[in-house]
Swiss-Prot record:
Associates with the helicase and the primase-associated factor to form the helicase-primase factor. Its EC number is 2.7.7.-. This is DNA primase. It is found in: Host nucleus. It comes from the Viruses. Essential component of the helicase/primase complex. Unwinds the DNA at the replication forks and generates single-stranded DNA for both leading and lagging strand synthesis. The primase initiates primer synthesis and thereby produces large amount of short RNA primers on the lagging strand that the polymerase elongates using dNTPs. The gene is MDV066. GO terms for molecular function: DNA-directed RNA polymerase activity; zinc ion binding. One of its GO terms (biological process) is DNA replication. The record marks D659, D661 as: Essential for primase activity.
Length: 1074
């Protein structure tokens, strides 16, 4: 038998040879061990399932088709091997314990060579060539004759030696593996290793003595002992292209590629890439279908005879995989580049930025975009170029990023995204409207005495019940709670309020008959009374409320007073002695005269002037009207320590009051803070000038009044761990109103801030009140700077409605974040870009007044709001501007303003200025996933009208409540007694969800609420949690009810809503119907 070269010569060759994945009828591992030890019969057959020849040695051999009429015929023609180099090195491989289609660069190789053959003679090379090209089985005798023992046992000698050492130790020590491991010391291993013969002799000895153990050990590193033809078809098929190309590439080529681009891609990814490799080939000569591949013999012939396994189609596929992956990555990198480029300039909150990223990827990778991309990267020729053929990134820019970038310029942002809705009514009509819908002027001027009422919640509640009963004979609604919000949209749709994502989570829309009299909605019932029209002579409900005989010719303010221990009181006044808390404007003017213009009037250093005046006036306030350090008095006393104006959606707005919280990474130096707030003012005025084009706003002189929470100067008394909720938390449902209800996420109350560890802020004696005016000294606010910003509504405009003010605050925030003087100055110190709270403008929400402090759970007073001067550059009368900070009419929402030129009412601000990402997500969701079934339709199908709160309550009581109680008894038995004899009260009704409160049975002792299900708390808060039912439709169109709980404890998330469990109502209703 002729030989072309010796084995020793070929060992020095760099030729990697051909890799063959083979199979046998039976266990491939047992077959291989028998072959390596010379125990295999020569008649056994080996089948080639797939192969990879980097040198493409058989490309010059003509392919001979089988007879299409007989699937069993295979060509036995001797191949022309003149162009095939000799000797031919072939690695026979098995699966490397690949249990699934999971890939990864850090995983072991997917196939592993188990023996190596060198084919040298014509007959040997013809046998392997026929097996590779035509799928002809190769006989075991040929493999025995051609096996390269030197190369083969280089693969196994170390493993065989380890087996020998272990099995020898096992025979000495028995089957106690622990003892075996302990006995394998260095000397023992060395002595045993020296006597072990390498190569075929060593493996044969092991195999003959320990056949089962050796076979089991090899099966641990080689797969193929249990794989079948069906396994290959199901894993890599079922179509021919995927079965041939994906099998070869995934098992034999991917991890050997020099670039390694596709190494980490799993099998499904490779199969998906096969689908866009649309190169046409002739049908498989065997004519087999996937269902016919029931044996390795047929599978081998099917794969080897396939036109996908040879020629340019097979050679070009690995290159196409790399090019396709590079094309995909290029589009993704382009998207990532745009996002990284936008991030520094797109000043939005972290939550909104996360939505922005998700939406950006969705815009690029939705169904239509993916179809277009896959069409662009599909090839019909093996070497077709796909570089930059995809338009994925370009479409993303056109469809999404261009719109987003319009937010980066305040002029374009307002011009393209904001649609103010206004009505020009003429001065005469607007003046009458303003006088009827703004506070009496006497309420905002200082008087010698207080006229009004200030009582705790329980007393106010009794007063309201009695008064409303008397007013029924005058036409007052018998079940009226808050009165219809006259300025709110949808006022004629008292119950069904369409959800508007431009509203903040704190804004309020409420059904008209949510609660009967005696319910907890104290605030809104007061607002309805004080804003009701009077009869002739100025006598109306407000007179009866306060017991005043004199005429009241206009609305009155309502205040909420926070008290210690979580209590609260409510104030309605007609006259007030404001000097009990606010220094008189005269004292401020006198102090400025005393300074004798030492602060200067030049504009050379505006920041130093502002800093000096802020410090001096703060000292004046502390020495003139000092708040107590701790309070525990009556409501009459505590109303001069803490007072919160309640926003009345029925009234017109005279001042734009912004609640600003600037969350900090680190304390900011005083000079930088004053410079940043000056930029903040510029952003406000720029936004107002664009929104209100007919207003004459002079940027150099228009007044903006700033008030800042006093710094934390000491830690005299920290908050106790049992502080569970803010003293300013109103006991109504305003925190749930007008919020998109997310069953997986908590809803934070905007008032729950700085509730733990509040420190005292005191002004000490005059001698110790000297202030360090070092401009580089950091502000004492380490975590947050709290500001109250008040801007008079410019003439000729008048604003109405909470929605208008909330929208205006969002636009101002966007404008401020686009103001370079603000962002570049304070940007390094900002923790996030959510700085203006737009949730404080809901009907019934309250906001603390300047000059008043906060009262925490223990009655400690802190965080007093004091003037923070930002004097306009062209201020004509600086003294007048400073004194104006002390006038109550300048920092109330509904205080009257000059109406001589008022002629336009701004009643709404629409457009996509806010909630752009949410709106876009909703539109895309409806397009690609279908419109979700609305709650109103789901209830209508069950005979319930969403506009009828009584019907909703009856439906829940009759069909749902029993299931809830049963579930609690089964799964939460420790709390079951609390849920006996429950009643339900409808709290919030919206188009997409309904919130109902579970009211416990007071006869069993749970008067204040339920116990927390999630945690056990201290005795004082053991029964302070609230439980609710949330009725909504899930993503699958099923009507569901969620049982949620709100606990005020810090470990429960401080007032966040937590879902306890969900009940599917549809299934129960269907059973009852049947």
């Amino acid at each position: 038998m002729a030989r072309f070269s010796s084995i020793s010569d070929t060992l020095e060759s760099d030729d990697s040879g051909i890799k063959v994945l083979f199979a046998v009828d039976g266990c491939a591992v047992s077959f291989s061990l028998a072959l390596l030890t010379g125990q295999i019969p020569s008649t056994n057959s080996v089948y080639v399932i797939g192969y990879w020849d980097p040198s493409d040695r058989f490309s010059s051999i003509p392919f001979l088709d089988g007879d299409p009429n007989t699937n069993e015929r295979i060509s036995t023609t001797v191949c022309n091997l003149e162009d095939v180099p000799s000797p031919l090195r072939v690695e026979f491989c098995l699966l490397n314990q690949m249990a699934s289609g999971m890939g990864g660069a850090d995983l072991k190789l997917r196939t592993r060579a188990i023996f190596v053959c060198r084919f040298t003679s014509w007959s040997e090379m013809n046998a392997i060539a026929n097996s590779i090209i035509y799928g002809t089985p190769i006989q075991a005798g040929v493999l025995q004759a051609t096996i390269s023992e030197t190369e083969t046992f280089m693969l196994h000698d170390e493993f065989n030696l380890a087996l020998h050492v272990f099995l020898n130790g096992l025979s000495l020590k028995g089957r106690n593996k622990k003892d075996v491991c302990m006995s394998l010391n260095h000397n023992y291993i060395s002595s045993v290793s020296e006597n072990f013969p390498r190569g075929k002799r060593g493996l044969t000895g092991l195999y003959l003595q320990h056949e089962q153990k050796v076979t089991a050990a090899y099966r641990r590193i080689y797969g193929g002992s249990t794989t079948t033809a069906f396994w290959y078809v199901s894993k890599f098929g079922p179509d021919e292209k995927s079965l041939v190309l994906a099998l070869r590439y995934y098992l034999l080529q991917a991890q050997e590629e020099v670039t390694g681009i596709a190494t980490g891609y799993d099998l499904q990814a490779i199969k998906d890439i096969c689908k866009t490799y649309a190169v046409s080939v002739n049908p498989n000569p065997t004519g087999f279908l996937a269902a016919d591949l029931t044996s390795f013999s047929r599978l081998s012939r099917f794969c080897c005879l396939s036109y996908y396994s040879k020629g340019s189609v097979a050679i070009a596929f690995p290159s196409y995989v790399e090019r396709r992956i590079m094309a995909d990555i290029a589009e993704v990198d382009a998207l990532r580049e745009y996002i990284e480029r936008d991030r520094p300039s797109l000043k939005i909150s972290d939550l909104e930025f996360v939505k922005y990223i998700y939406l950006a990827y969705f815009e690029c990778y939705n169904r239509e975009q993916l179809k277009r991309h896959l069409k662009d990267v599909t090839v019909s020729l093996p070497d077709e170029d796909i570089y930059k053929k995809s338009s994925l990134g370009k479409c993303a820019v056109e469809n999404f990023f261009t719109h987003v970038r319009s937010r980066l310029n305040v002029n374009d942002h307002i011009a393209h995204n904001v649609l103010p809705e206004q009505v020009e009514m003429g001065n005469k009509l607007v003046r009458k409207f303003g006088r009827a819908r703004m506070y009496l002027s006497t309420t905002m001027t200082n008087e010698s005495h207080f006229t009004g009422i200030c009582e705790c919640a329980s007393v106010i509640l009794k007063r309201l019940d009695t008064l409303e009963m008397k007013l029924q004979k005058y036409g007052w609604p018998s079940d009226r709670v808050d009165g219809s919000n006259l300025m709110a949209d949808n006022q004629n749709n008292s119950t069904l309020i369409p959800y508007d994502k431009s509203r903040s989570s704190g804004m309020i829309l409420e059904c008209s008959n949510t609660h009967s009299r005696g319910g907890p909605m104290i605030v809104k019932r007061l607002l309805a009374l004080v804003s009701a029209d009077s009869r002739a002579g100025g006598i109306g409900p407000a007179n009866m409320l306060m017991g005043i005989d004199s005429a009241i010719d206009g609305p009155l303010p309502v205040y909420r007073v926070g008290m210690s221990k979580g209590r609260q009181a409510f104030t309605v006044l007609m006259t007030e002695c404001w000097e009990r808390t606010i220094p008189s404007p005269g004292s401020a003017k006198a102090h400025l005269i005393k300074l004798n213009n030492s602060y200067g009037t030049s504009t050379e250093d505006l920041i130093s002037r502002d800093l000096f005046l802020t410090s001096e006036i703060e000292q004046l306030i502390g020495s003139t009207v000092e708040l107590p350090e701790i309070t525990c008095g009556s409501a009459d006393e505590q109303q001069y320590i803490n007072r919160n104006e309640v926003f009345n959606g029925n009234l017109a707005i005279g001042n734009i009051v912004l609640d600003v919280d600037i969350h900090l990474r680190n304390p900011i130096p005083l000079r930088l803070m004053h410079a940043a707030i000056r930029g903040f003012r510029s952003g406000i005025l720029r936004a107002l000038a664009l929104l209100l084009p007919k207003a004459n706003i002079d940027h150099g002189s228009y007044p903006c009044y700033f008030y800042k929470s006093s710094c934390k100067k000491s830690r005299v008394m920290g908050g106790a761990p049992w502080m569970l909720h803010d003293a300013e938390l109103a006991p109504d449902y305003s925190m749930f109103e007008n919020a998109e209800f997310d069953l997986e996420m908590g809803i934070d109350d905007p008032l729950l801030i700085d509730q733990i560890d509040e420190s005292l802020t005191r002004w000490s004696s005059e001698s110790s009140r000297s202030v360090d005016l070092d401009p580089d000294k950091p502000c004492g606010c380490h975590d947050k700077i709290g500001l109250r910003v008040c801007i008079p509504v410019p003439s000729p405009y008048l604003l109405v409605g909470s929605k208008t003010l909330a929208g205006l605050s969002r636009i101002i925030q966007q404008a401020v974040l686009l103001e370079r003087n603000f962002v570049e100055t304070i940007g390094p110190y900002l923790k996030n870009y959510e700085i203006i709270d737009s949730g404080v403008y809901g009907h019934g929400r309250s906001l603390r007044l300047p000059f008043f402090g906060k009262i925490d759970e223990n009655g400690i007073v802190s965080r007093r709001l004091v003037p923070f001067f930002v004097i306009p550059d062209d201020c004509a009368d600086m003294e007048k501007f400073i004194v104006a900070h002390f006038e109550p009419k300048n920092f109330h929402f509904h205080s009257s303003i000059p109406l001589e030129k008022a002629a336009i009412i701004l009643k709404d601000i629409g457009g996509e200025y806010a909630g752009f990402f949410e709106r876009k997500i909703t539109v895309n969701r409806d397009i690609f996933f279908g419109t979700r079934l609305s709650l109103s339709i789901a209830l209508r199908e069950r005979g319930v009208d969403i506009n009828d709160c009584a019907a909703i309550t009856t439906f829940v009581t009759d069909h749902i409540l029993d299931d809830i109680i049963t579930y609690v008894y089964e799964h939460i038995p420790d709390h079951a007694i609390e849920y006996q004899n429950l009643s339900v009260s409808c709290c919030v009704v919206k188009s997409d969800w309904i919130l109902l409160q579970l009211i416990p049975n007071k006869t069993i002792g749970y008067r204040h609420g339920f116990t927390c299900v999630r945690f056990k708390h201290a005795r004082a808060r053991r029964a302070s949690a609230r439980s609710y039912l949330a009725l909504n439709v899930d993503a699958h169109g099923r009507l569901c009810v969620c049982v949620i709980q709100q606990c005020f404890a810090a470990k429960c998330g401080n007032n966040k809503l937590r879902t306890l469990f969900t009940v599917d109502i549809d299934s129960k209703c269907r059973l009852e119907h049947q």
